[in-house]
Structures are given as C-alpha cells and as structure tokens.
Amino acid sequence: MTTSRCSHLPEVLPDCTSSAAPVVKTVEDCGSLVNGQPQYVMQVSAKDGQLLSTVVRTLATQSPFNDRPMCRICHEGSSQEDLLSPCECTGTLGTIHRSCLEHWLSSSNTSYCELCHFRFAVERKPRPLVEWLRNPGPQHEKRTLFGDMVCFLFITPLATISGWLCLRGAVDHLHFSSRLEAVGLIALTVALFTIYLFWTLVSFRYHCRLYNEWRRTNQRVILLIPKSVNVPSNQPSLLGLHSVKRNSKETVV
C-alpha cells in the first residue's frame, strides 16, 4: 500500500493524480437496505480521474417471502396446492408440490430424489394408445406415423382389388387353356401380396417399438405418501432460522 499527498473523504476514493495505477476499493452498498443488511458488494475503481463501479456479488438477504415454504420445482407457495416433504431433504429443498413431483418423476423416468436419493413409493400406470396416436413424440415420428397410416389405408384396398383381379384373370385363362398367362398372373398376385405383407410387418414392428418406448417413458406416476408429510402454510422455512453474517464493509486497496 502506497501513500501520497492526497485528500481522503469518507467512502470516496483517493484523488491521486500522480499514481498511474488504478486504485480499487470494494464496499458494500448501503443505499438499499433490507432489514438493515446491505444487498450487494460493489467494486469501485479510479482510472485517469474517472470512477468505475462494478457489482462484484450480491448478498443473501432475508425477506418476508423467504419465511414461507415454497415448492423447489415451481417456486410457488401453498396457495394453489398443499406442500409436501416426501423425502429426506431439508430447508427450502424439502418442500414440493405433489403434482410437480409426479410430473418430474414421469418426465425423468425415475423413482428417487436426485438430491438425497430417497426412493419414493409410486404407482405407475401406462397411458392409453389414443394419447400416443395424438402425440407420438418428436416431429419426424409424427410424420412417419401419419405417412404410414395414409399408405396403409390407401395400399390395403388397392392390393386387395389388384389381387382379386389377377386371380379372376388367372381363372379365365385356365378355362381357355392359357396356362402360361394364368401362371404369370398367379405369380404376380403372390409377389404383390408378399411385398404388401412385408411392408406392413416392418412398419407395424417399427411403430410397436416406438409405442413401447413411449409407453415405458411416459407413464402416469401416482405418488403414494402418508398424509403426515403435509407442510402447513404457516410453518416458517429453515431459511429464516439462519442469519446472514456478513461484514458491514470490505475494503481492498
């Protein structure tokens, strides 16, 4: 630390015109207080006769909203839905809405807490087939399902009519002793139905695999918990029990 002939005022940086190096001072801004506590630490530097200020970090402050428990997923209180404490987490991470937890367990396809690894008692129910037909997943899977359904509805009657006409032609040729033409029409009918059945089988297996995967990862989760885990809305959270211990001022020169 160097000294020079400079005038010092409270909370004002030294006015040193002879020093070329910038002077840095870190103070806690007390202009905006919450319950007598500063809200953030501001770094003030002087360079070329100009003051430059930067917020270094914010300080944890207590507010009336922190005294009420809230859901750790949606950060909402218990006004719309009761809060639960179904796992071993404590403090602000220990309360959660039942619907939020069930939605998270369904989306993540897990049955335990990601923080304390407590395993929940859940009941999983598969979703109906109609819901998968409405929303099978990504956009390319929707296009594939829609295209295959249209092709199936269009090709099935076309293949049936074509096969029937070929067989009728083969029977007529047999009556007129045209065995070569009859054999050709029968072979064409067999090839037509073979290609149709092969395409139908491959498409059906592909969509069955997608449906089974969707059904496994998109189950309806029902949380099985006792009623004793409900958290009253007037119970203060553990965050309000811990006081914020900060120095009133930090100075670095």
UniProtKB/Swiss-Prot annotation:
Topology versus the membrane: Multi-pass membrane protein
Pathway listed: Protein modification; protein ubiquitination
Places the protein is found: Cytoplasmic vesicle membrane; Early endosome membrane
Record keywords: Cytoplasmic vesicle, Endocytosis, Endosome, Membrane, Metal-binding, Phosphoprotein, Transferase, Transmembrane, Transmembrane helix, Ubl conjugation pathway, Zinc, Zinc-finger
Protein name as annotated: E3 ubiquitin-protein ligase MARCHF3
Quaternary structure and interacting proteins, as annotated: Interacts with MARCHF2 and STX6.
SMART domains: RINGv
Stated role: E3 ubiquitin-protein ligase which may be involved in endosomal trafficking. E3 ubiquitin ligases accept ubiquitin from an E2 ubiquitin-conjugating enzyme in the form of a thioester and then directly transfer the ubiquitin to targeted substrates.
Domain free text: The RING-CH-type zinc finger domain is required for E3 ligase activity.
GO molecular function: ubiquitin-protein transferase activity; zinc ion binding
InterPro entries (UniProt xref): Znf_RING, Znf_RING-CH, Znf_RING/FYVE/PHD
Disulfide bonds: none
Main location: membrane
Reaction equation(s) it catalyzes: S-ubiquitinyl-[E2 ubiquitin-conjugating enzyme]-L-cysteine + [acceptor protein]-L-lysine = [E2 ubiquitin-conjugating enzyme]-L-cysteine + N(6)-ubiquitinyl-[acceptor protein]-L-lysine
Presence of keyword Cytoplasm: no
Residue spans crossing the bilayer: 145-165, 182-202
GO cellular component annotations of the record: early endosome membrane; endosome; intracellular membrane-bounded organelle; lysosome
Stored Pfam families: RINGv
Zinc finger (RING-CH-type): 63-123
Modified residues (Phosphoserine): 237, 243
